[in-house]
């Protein structure tokens, strides 16, 4: 019986373990697969979210870098504008200094030359040298030895030089062109006249048609203008001679800012429409475009 019981126990043991295994295998297989798939999907979602966060972070960094670059560009543009304004101021100061120096040299040369222009042009604009009645020593008779006579002649010569200087102060006074008024006449009539200043916003740039074709003038000095249509051909009024070059003249017809303001005032009083460009052909100083000629 014992052997039989042991046999029986041994026979029923596997059935007991089979029952225990069936209890653990009660969850269906498709639910296990779904749980596995859910874990995989969660991992994928987490990786996608991490990638999105990294992309957003990179985008924010790029936006901040762009803002910094824009700020640096704006600062560079401001520095460039400041440098350009300083350069323009330096150019204006240089032009003013050059104009003042040139005017001082011309006035000094005029005074030292005794009324005769050193630049080779006649101060009266007619192309003929003005001869002073100065008696050379060779023409003085030998019997004239009285010091009073010599002193009298010196006084007469000084008076002649002073008269020439007074007339030579105004180049346009000696020989005014037909139908034109000299500068002294303008100054005498400008008393009490409201001067019209040039306004770039409402007035066009003046023109010049001295060569037959109308061309725009360039700014010169403090409010003045210079013609751009001067050529190397001969003109009615020669340009001043260059001080450092023997056979060359200064290029361009020039007009100072004060003269241009008086011209605008005169034209406005005569009823000229200042919204149209002014032709400065007939208003330049008495010198012109023959720059490269032999000066005798």
Curated annotation (Swiss-Prot):
Q: Which residues form a coiled coil?
A: 66-97
Region Alanine-zipper: what ranges?
55-90
GO biological process terms, alphabetically, are: regulation of developmental process; response to ethylene
Give the record's keywords alphabetically: Coiled coil, DNA-binding, Nucleus, Transcription, Transcription regulation
Tissue distribution: Expressed in seedlings, leaves and pistils. Detected in the base of flowers and tips of carpels, in sepal and petal vasculature, in anthers, in young rosette, in the lateral and primary roots, and in the whole ovule.
Q: Which GO terms describe its molecular function?
A: DNA binding; protein homodimerization activity
How is this protein named in the record? Protein BASIC PENTACYSTEINE4
Species in which this protein is naturally found: Arabidopsis thaliana (Mouse-ear cress)
